[in-house]
Amino acid sequence: MDFINRTTPEIAKDLLGVKLIFDDGENQFSGYIVETEAYLGKIDEAAHSYNGRQTPRVQSMYKDGGTIYAHVMHTHLLINLVTQPAGTAEGVLIRALEPELITDQMIENRNGKVGIDVTNGPGKWTRAFNMSMALDGLRLNEGPLSIDTKARKYPSSILESPRIGVPNKGEWTHKPLRFTVEGNPYVSRMRKSDMLAAEDTWKKHK
């Protein structure tokens, strides 16, 4: 997948349906991305790199597109994929996945949570997959975290909406930079009345 020669929102949309795979050394976990958010670097008041901010914790954002930027928020590990050439500091937050298979190990990692609650949030799926900050700064597909763009799915419909948890950021609070597979029950904060059967949210053929 090209993480450099397209806009970050375009990449965030194209990641929906892509298969993400993580191997923790003992178990392999996989799922299809159903929710992403784009962060547009130095101009984006919600981005960690806003105004060119550079601290030790955000250095990975300044690397080439395809780098993993991991950070912890409220004890939750969040995984972002860096986009654009080195120094641009834009990226895509992976907010939720539809598991290829919910395994007993995933349920154990989520302290007994079952069903959609296993992976329907940015800190939930990373815990289910037993991820750690050791991923920060690594290259996608060159270590334990990879994506498969051939075994992917294609959303029947994509919704665009404001990002979650971005208050008091002026126009950036309201920009439609969150992308979701419409109706997929694994999308975070999905109302039950809006949920469809997961298989009905994907195109039957490309």
Swiss-Prot record:
**Sorted alphabetically, which InterPro entries does this protein's record hold?**
Formyl_transferase-like_C_sf, MPG, MPG_sf
- State whether keyword DNA damage applies: yes
Assigned EC number: 3.2.2.-
Q: Gene3D superfamilies from the entry? A: Methylpurine-DNA glycosylase (MPG)
User: Do you know which SUPFAM superfamilies this protein is assigned to?
Assistant: FMT C-terminal domain-like (SSF50486)
Q: Keywords assigned by UniProt?
A: DNA damage, DNA repair, Hydrolase
Q: What class of enzyme is it?
A: hydrolase
**Its GO biological process terms?**
base-excision repair
The domain of life is: Bacteria
**Family annotation (Pfam families):** Pur_DNA_glyco (PF02245)
Gene Ontology molecular function: alkylbase DNA N-glycosylase activity; DNA binding
Q: Give the family from UniProt.
A: Belongs to the DNA glycosylase MPG family.
Question: NCBIfam families from the entry?
Answer: 3mg
> Which HAMAP family does the entry link to?
3MGH
Q: Tell me the protein's name.
A: Putative 3-methyladenine DNA glycosylase
